[in-house]
């Protein structure tokens, strides 16, 4: 009939455990790699949110304030009398 020894059975079980362990390790490594890529993408988005967007906002706002100051707040330049300049 069947001539299965205990050592053969242990060897087969050991092979199955080894294959399952290798598959688990590969799965863990792949998941860790994908998670690190996800973190990198999140950090790039965070960099955009914390650095780039406020800089663009400050640039546009300061440009608006500069135009407003030059057009409405700043007093007109004083006219200089030519006689005063000639006497100097």
From Swiss-Prot:
Protein name per its UniProtKB record: Envelope small membrane protein
InterPro entries attached to this UniProt entry: E_protein_bCoV, E_protein_CoV
Source organism phylogeny: Viruses, Riboviria, Orthornavirae, Pisuviricota, Pisoniviricetes
Topological domains, Intravirion: 38-79
Quaternary structure and interacting proteins, as annotated: Homopentamer. Interacts with membrane protein M in the budding compartment of the host cell, which is located between endoplasmic reticulum and the Golgi complex. Interacts with Nucleoprotein.
Transmembrane segments: 17-37
Organism (species): Murine coronavirus (strain JHM) (MHV-JHM)
Residues in the Virion surface compartment per record: 1-16
This protein's UniProt keywords: Apoptosis, Host Golgi apparatus, Host membrane, Membrane, Transmembrane, Transmembrane helix
Protein task: Plays a central role in virus morphogenesis and assembly. Acts as a viroporin and self-assembles in host membranes forming pentameric protein-lipid pores that allow ion transport. Also plays a role in the induction of apoptosis.
């Amino acid at each position: 009939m069947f001539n299965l020894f205990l050592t053969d059975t242990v060897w087969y079980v050991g092979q199955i455990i080894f294959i399952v362990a290798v598959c688990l390790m590969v799965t863990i490594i792949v998941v860790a790699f994908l998670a690190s890529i996800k973190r990198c993408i999140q950090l790039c988005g965070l960099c955009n949110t914390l650095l780039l967007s406020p800089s663009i906002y400050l640039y546009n706002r300061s440009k608006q304030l500069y135009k407003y100051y030059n057009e409405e707040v700043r007093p007109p330049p004083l006219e200089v009398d030519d006689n005063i300049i000639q006497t100097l």
